[in-house]
């Protein structure tokens, strides 16, 4: 087994954890949007969060197709977080781009 294959195999469990942690970085944005009820939504780009959602959805589908939880688990969680951002932006701003 080549060195890169051994490294990749060893990183697999860590990358699954990172895939779960990474989308959680959206939590402060969601908190500001839904809980603190600040004017924060006015500074957010609906287009950006729609693109994040679309990209995460594609990665989720790709990961499911390849039966690779390292790809689909984190991206599925990210997709849900990003959709929550999209809904919040639309609800609080009427959908500014």
Curated annotation (Swiss-Prot):
Protein keywords: Cell membrane, Membrane, Sugar transport, Transmembrane, Transmembrane helix, Transport
Annotated TM spans: 15-35, 44-65, 71-91
Membrane topology according to the record: Multi-pass membrane protein
Molecular function via GO: identical protein binding
GO cellular component, one term: plasma membrane
Segments forming domain PQ-loop: 4-70
Protein name stated in the entry: Sugar transporter SemiSWEET
Source organism of this protein record: Vibrio sp. (strain N418)
């Amino acid at each position: 087994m080549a060195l890169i294959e051994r490294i990749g195999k060893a990183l697999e469990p860590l990358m699954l954890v990172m895939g779960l942690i990474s989308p959680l970085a959206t939590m402060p944005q969601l908190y500001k949007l839904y809980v603190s009820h600040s004017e924060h939504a006015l500074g957010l780009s609906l287009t950006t969060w729609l693109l994040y959602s679309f990209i995460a959805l594609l990665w989720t589908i790709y990961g499911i197709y390849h039966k690779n939880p390292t790809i689909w688990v984190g991206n599925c969680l990210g997709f849900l977080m990003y959709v929550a951002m999209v809904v919040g932006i639309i609800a609080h701003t009427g959908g500014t781009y």
